[in-house]
Amino acid sequence: YAKLDRVVYRDQTTRANLGATLTTKDSRNYLNDQFLQVSSRDLTVLDLDGSLSTRLFGGVLMMEAGLAQGLDTLGALSDPANLPDTAPHAQFRKYKLGLNYQYPFSVFGQEASFSSLFSGQHAEDVLYGSEQMLIGSLYSVRGFVRNTLSGDHGYYWRNELSTRIPLRFGDTT
């Protein structure tokens, strides 16, 4: 893959970045050592992203927005002219948005923090699995460890309160 990233603005509290990434994705699937042609594909994706981080109300706000475009280049699968709208597209377009706010505070002298994370995407086309949004891990939805959900469009919003609780073993902490 190839990546360009540039800081376009910076001051004491704010930083803005713009970036572009060109990625080739080579998917090879097998079942019992048998190559599965129908579910194996090569995709080329151009991602254009922007991000901003700034201090806000005593915390830190991070925002990311992006566009991903599937390209017909560098050996990628090419969509046929008569491809139905219900079939996955190698030449696709999807939009991504991420917001994250972290706020440190203290309660009765104990340090704690609040974080709120929003992540979402919207696709104009049906996507192959490698491009779909996937939720179902400790990092997206608590309690979703064994099961996952995926789709062309989706979002999740996760809020978290955390603090450190010291454990004491005898005379040591």
Where do the model's predicted regions map?
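Polar, glycine-rich mid-to-C-terminal structural blocks
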Residues: 10-31, 47
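Phosphate/diphosphate-binding loops
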Residues: 1
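C-terminal outer-membrane beta-barrel translocator/porin domains of Gram-negative envelope proteins
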Residues: 26-172
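Extracytoplasmic assembly/pore-lining segments of large envelope/extracellular complexes
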Residues: 8-12, 56-59
